[in-house]
Amino acid sequence: MQGFGVHTSMWTMNWDKPGAERAVAAAAHYGMDFIEIALLNAPAVDAAHSRALLEKHGLKAICSLGLPQNAWASVRPDRAIEHLKVALDKAADMGCLALSGVTYGGIGERTGVPPTQNEIDNVATALEAAARHAKSRGLLLGIEPVNRYENHLLNTGWQAVALVEKVGAENMFIHLDTYHMNIEEKGAANGILDARKYLKYIHLSESDRGTPGCGTCDWDEVFAALAAIGFTGGLAMESFINMPPEIAHGLSVWRPVAKDESEVMENGLPFLRNKAKQYKLI
């Protein structure tokens, strides 16, 4: 995945036909190279419809998800494998290039103690099986570290490297997120430098998940680090504008983070594109 993309939460978290049509058309209007589809209910998605939409508008796509509680890999690796296989099949049928996100667990998965070796072993077992299935469908499989308040298993770039190397699948990659890095890493560059060997995708998300350039993220440090490692992967803007209550609860989004999607797309996107150009990433 290369170029600039956007998470479809900008317009919808419900990937039904109306939601897909709105998001794909809007992403194309703003000149995106790809979109990231929140695959929260894979069985309900009309893959042929989505594939046709993407082809019509000339967009590539990646899918992302978090595992539901009954399929958390740390405690139910068998259920996680089953859930991921269904999602991978749907992503492949849509013509997507990868499945990423919190593929190892769920938003809100916390035990109150650090992850145990048994939990990490279970996660690795699930991801190994999922990576094999992904490879059979021509897909990459990513893992996204998130902050300590959303999950206790994977919070930093170096933890993601350790998990990728434990699984040992050649089609696995690391997917970082500046919002989570702003909480967990010792400086914006650290996670990028730690994950450099496997880093193929990054969420560009402001400190409040609103409009990039209007918060506390050190964007110069982020883009300088990406330039330093010769990053050629996907740059995906993520801002949580249209959140259904059940997802907003899990992400602790209690108020609007921006006026509307136009504010983010017309101010945040040019800001990020200019930074990428400044550091010769596009």
Residue ranges and their predicted role:
Residues 11-12, 68-71, 106-109, 147-149, ...:
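A short, flexible beta-alpha/helix-coil linker loop
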Residues 47-58, 126-134, 191-194, 221-226:
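Catalytic-core regions built around general acid/base machinery
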Residues 17, 76-173, 183, 255-266, ...:
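Active-site acidic/histidine proton-transfer and metal-coordination neighborhood
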Residues 21, 33, 37-125, 232, ...:
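Structural motif corresponding to the early beta-alpha repeats
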Residues 35-38, 116-117, 148-150, 176-180, ...:
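Short linear motifs at secondary-structure transitions and domain/linker junctions
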Residues 1-8, 12-28, 55, 95-96, ...:
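Histidine-acidic metal/acid-base catalytic patches
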Residues 5-8, 35-36, 64-65, 100-103, ...:
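Short beta-strands and strand-loop turn motifs
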